[in-house]
Amino acid sequence: MASEPLDLTSRDQRSLDSDEAIPLEPCTVVAFIGRTERGPLDEPVAIKGFDHYRRVFGGHCSFSFVSFAVEHFFLHGGETAVVVRVANRAGRALLEVPAGAGVLKLEAREPGGREFLRVSVDYDRVEQQPDRFNLVVQRLGRPSSQLVDDQELFEGVSMNPAAERFVVDALNESELVRLVGPPPLARPDATRSARPGEPIPYLAATVPGTDGEELTDYDVIGSNTEGTGIFALDRCEQVDLLCIPSPPGRDLGSTSFVAATRYCERRRALLVWDPPWSWSSPSAALLGIRTSARASRCALTYFPRVRPRGDVGRYEEGMPASGVVAGLLARRDRRGAWHELPGEESSLKGNLVPAIEVDAPHALALQRAGVNAFVRTEPGVVTFQGDVSLAGPGCAEGWWRRLGVVRLTSFVLRSIEHYTRWVFAAERPEELVIDLERQVWIFLARLQERAALAGSAPDQGFFVRATPRTDSSGVAITLRVGFAAERPNEFLTYDFRFREPTMTTEIVAVAGAERRLG
């Protein structure tokens, strides 16, 4: 189980220094949260493909769209995902192995109705040692199947607490089962075949696992102190996009939206929010977004949902397209977060089509209201259009409604914060300010060369100023950075405050700031 930060970057941050060039095309990490068939609960698991997902979390199921979202993500250009499984009162399967007058009780390590476990016991090569036995634990693809998905073998396990292979210690290493209660006094009875030469029989679960109930907002949000739900992502070094696919026929509540957008704001990430199921037409979507109280520049939404081509009956209302959107954005990021994908590269793939057709006038109206749209541009081609965030009409600064500005800003802040951590272990403290300014100046200059920043000259597109300072708050140095995301000399300005006592960097937006630090 993951307990240390899940580092999905290619370089150990301890090797960073002032000569390290800040990359312009980092890997985009997308997090998915929701119910799955099986897998570890409230643990961030890095996934590199849909086959990998299936091995850890199982396949498609009727109570969740998470598996579809992950599949769509990789199909549309995504490369790195993190999946956090959450559940509401899911139960664990129980296995009871006779052991003389007692019982060895085992339960599934993870809850769920798809944990089809079985065990066998034999005494091969330990017949003369009455406290020892061999235990085989298997997970099957389905009940009574001979297809084994996972298997664990514990050889020479002992019932003696002083033994090196004491059963309690041995089962602590299992990823499939765990011991329930104290072990029996006698070793488990061997599961012998009825006739010589027949396969050794297995014992199935006496109490099956359960998938639990529908998720509540609080299952999704989880606990900050316990590191569950959304907060399990704190163990990830990097999160760029967050998807919480809505369950079949049911919307997640406003509490989930508020918590997720606040979390994304803290992590400089973006929430891909699925549209309500009540958006059954372009007109309903327009009415819905205009009367909705949900707004955040750290989120985007879209319309319509998608479905497999020709499969109208099974998915009449469609399925969430958050995985599609995340995959397209991750693909765009490989060219730079500020780029827009050409139409042919932002199209639906994998035999997916819009659940509802949206014509050009409705698509334009939706985009003006803050909703991106899947639009049929030619026969057989549907593209993702809009480039708008969910900042809403109440946002005073109009540039935050542009998805490109939101993502560029997050990318710049996150990159500077990560790649300037060398400041806390600088080997040349007397040159720290110069080295810091140079590193960030080069990064922003390269962005301007790529047309990510406005202006034809550096002073029109950005500025960098660093000032050493020591005050009661423990700030050792402040770096002020301004960059023009839309128009020359109109800067978004931020202070990076490097705090030595905690070795953390505080990022503060500075409205109407001077280029120099006072």
Label each residue range with its predicted role.
Residues 1-112, 138-141, 231-518:
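Structured, hydrophobic secondary-structure cores that serve as assembly/anchoring elements
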Residues 1-34, 58-76, 101-225, 258, ...:
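Small/polar, repeat-rich beta-turn/loop motifs that tile beta-strand-dominated architectures
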